[in-house]
Amino acid sequence: MAGGWPMIPLLLLTVVALAIILERFWTLRRKTVLPVGLGEEVRAWAARGNLDPTHIDSLRRTSPLGALLAAALDVRHRPRDQIRERIEDVGRHLVHRMEKFLNTLGSIAAAGPLLGLFGTVVGMIQMFLGILDSGVGDVNELAGGIGKALVCTAAGMIVAIPALFFHRYFRGRIAGYIVEMEHEAIQLLDTLDTPRAGAPVAAGGRGIVPPVSGS
């Protein structure tokens, strides 16, 4: 194998990085984190006062946004500042969950070039020890040995550059989600402060909001 045995951990890091990138792409889809119309639907539900615990639990399981809004509804009878504290606490847990595996991806981005450099150094040491034992010999063989040693450096960069790019990309996407989730939570707080009896069901509801019983 060109580059020698240090290529093995680099190949393993490549597989792990690819798996993390694909998993995070699937998990951090917008419709999975911030379902369209969910905030409006929950505000209409809260305004009507139809806050059955069963429906709150159902909301909690829909998405990270649903979990955040459900946390606010759990403590809706408390003062506004306590509701905000609950939202912030649950929000931290949700961010931690959305950032799952990103530290690993960042570590791969940092370790890839170092492993590549290590492989190159090992290859150069082996080559110069061979020269010490048998002399310079053919210059072409010397150039070939240097080229094989540098393969590790190139491989390390090939692993690290995409890992670093997607690490930053996912961090940015999560930061954007956090801003939107905070906005939806504040809007729900305002709705809880000024309940509106008989508010209509939000268009495009997904069955989370219970039907209004007739008088």
Explain the meaning of each model-derived region:
Residues 1-38:
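Hydrophobic membrane-targeting segments
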Residues 2-7, 94-112, 145, 149-156:
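Loop-to-transmembrane-helix entry motif
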Residues 4, 18, 53-54, 69, ...:
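Residue-level signature of catalytic and energy-coupling elements of molecular machines
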Residues 7-20, 106-113, 159-163:
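Alpha-helical transmembrane segments of integral membrane proteins
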Residues 10-15, 25-26, 56, 98-101, ...:
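Short hydrophobic/aromatic-rich motifs at helix boundaries and adjacent loops
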Residues 31-118, 122-136, 166-215:
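Predominantly long cytosolic amphipathic alpha-helical stalk/bundle segments
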Residues 140-171:
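Pore-lining and gate-forming transmembrane alpha-helices of multi-pass membrane transport proteins
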